[in-house]
């Protein structure tokens, strides 16, 4: 259940709601009865699980409301987003990180799974693949520390859309290896894949083809859940029939793939890029840890994470002019991979990029 902006931010604050923006970005539910009616309407057919995205204000009150009204199957929340940095909520970045952590802990205490809506938000803003991979590692680490037992990782392919299939797959495999390094008897990970929200072509035949080829690529990482993005995404909000059609298309592709498909993950080019990304990601993670050398676990410290964004260790080109991040990083698609580059478009190693970031931060301070 995708909520509109006022449902997510101002559900408990009707006076702050703007009737002119009703339905902006999702379903305009306004009362608990609205949610109960939606849940009752779903009690037919195969009696599906139902879940909604978390609120962007009054987080714990909103979470409790979702559990009571729609038996929320799992929490879906972010770590760095859905706050003042992206305009989706009122909280400053560091406070928002703390609130997201509290929300994870609340669900962990109740043995409710948590889905991470995080890495692809960096990808959609043209961040380099290394930053996306680093955030995958950080979110998994934070979720485990907050007591989450079942973590649903979200891998949005084609984000940004100028990734090649080869490099997209390599990035996903790197994220999987990094995130799943925390798996043990107390912490399970369920892989969820989806097609890129910004990747669909406008033409209907091309969009249908894109959905099918995207799901086939996703199946190579053996997802437990496929989040189907309707093929109409680039043109209009999907109708019920179009949602059903999109799900049937994705389901058929998944069935075909499960009968036996070539192993695209074995491509040596894919494997080489995956290993490169993992190595470069650890360079970035070490740089973030070094911001707070006196802490035992800097990667789960809200102040450290907010500072990593503030100085540009975690950055994206589309964060330019943002009060919480420099947006100074430059990226380019090179051979289908998203890499950080210098002013002349030359690819930078992660060590080179970090040295530039730290030098700039020292001057600014």
Model-assigned labels for residue ranges:
Residues 1-14, 18, 45, 225-238, ...:
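Acidic, glycine-enriched catalytic cores built around paired aspartates
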Residues 1-160, 350-365:
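Catalytic alpha/beta active-site cores
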Residues 5-8, 17, 61, 95, ...:
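Residue-identity detector for glutamine
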Residues 15, 21, 42, 52-54, ...:
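Generic serine detector
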Residues 28-33, 55-61, 65, 170, ...:
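Aromatic-enriched hydrophobic runs in primary sequence
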Residues 28-35, 59, 93-96, 100, ...:
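Generic structural signal for well-ordered, non-membrane alpha-helical segments
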Residues 39-46, 67-70, 104-111, 144, ...:
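Structural signal for hydrophobic packing residues in well-ordered secondary-structure cores
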Residues 90-91, 111-245:
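Long alpha-helical, hydrophobic tracts
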């Amino acid at each position: 259940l995708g909520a509109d902006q006022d449902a997510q931010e101002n559900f408990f604050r009707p006076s702050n709601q703007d009737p002119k923006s009703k339905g902006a970005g999702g379903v305009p539910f306004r009362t608990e009865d609205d949610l109960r009616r939606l849940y009752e309407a779903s009690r037919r057919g195969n009696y599906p699980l139902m879940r909604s995205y978390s609120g962007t204000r009054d987080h714990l009150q909103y979470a409790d409301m979702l559990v009571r009204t729609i038996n929320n199957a799992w929490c879906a929340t972010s770590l760095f987003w859905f706050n003042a940095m992206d305009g989706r909520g009122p909280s400053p970045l560091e406070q928002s990180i703390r609130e997201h952590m509290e929300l994870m802990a609340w669900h962990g205490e109740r043995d409710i799974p948590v889905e991470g809506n995080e890495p692809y938000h960096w990808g959609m803003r043209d961040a380099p693949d290394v930053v996306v991979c680093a955030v995958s590692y950080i979110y998994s680490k934070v979720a485990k520390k907050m007591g989450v037992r079942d973590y649903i990782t979200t891998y949005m392919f084609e984000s940004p859309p100028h990734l090649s299939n080869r490099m997209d797959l390599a990035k996903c495999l790197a994220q999987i290896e990094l995130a799943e390094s925390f798996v043990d008897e107390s912490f399970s990970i369920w892989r969820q894949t989806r097609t890129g929200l910004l990747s669909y072509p406008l033409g209907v035949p091309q969009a249908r083809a894109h959905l099918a080829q995207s799901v086939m690529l996703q199946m190579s990482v053996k997802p437990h859940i496929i989040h189907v993005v309707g093929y109409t995404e680039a043109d209009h909000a999907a109708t019920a029939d179009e949602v059903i059609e999109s799900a049937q298309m994705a389901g058929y592709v998944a069935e075909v793939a499960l009968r036996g498909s070539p192993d695209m993950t074995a491509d040596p080019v894919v494997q080489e890029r995956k290993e490169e990304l993992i190595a470069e990601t650890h360079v970035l993670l070490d740089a973030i840890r070094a911001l707070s050398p006196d802490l035992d676990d800097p990667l789960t410290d809200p102040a450290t994470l907010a500072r990593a964004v503030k100085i540009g260790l975690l950055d994206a080109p589309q964060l330019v002019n943002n009060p919480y991040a420099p947006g100074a990083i430059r990226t380019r698609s090179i051979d289908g991979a998203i890499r950080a580059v210098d002013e002349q478009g030359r690819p930078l190693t992660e060590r080179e990029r970090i040295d530039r970031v730290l030098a700039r931060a020292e001057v600014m301070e």
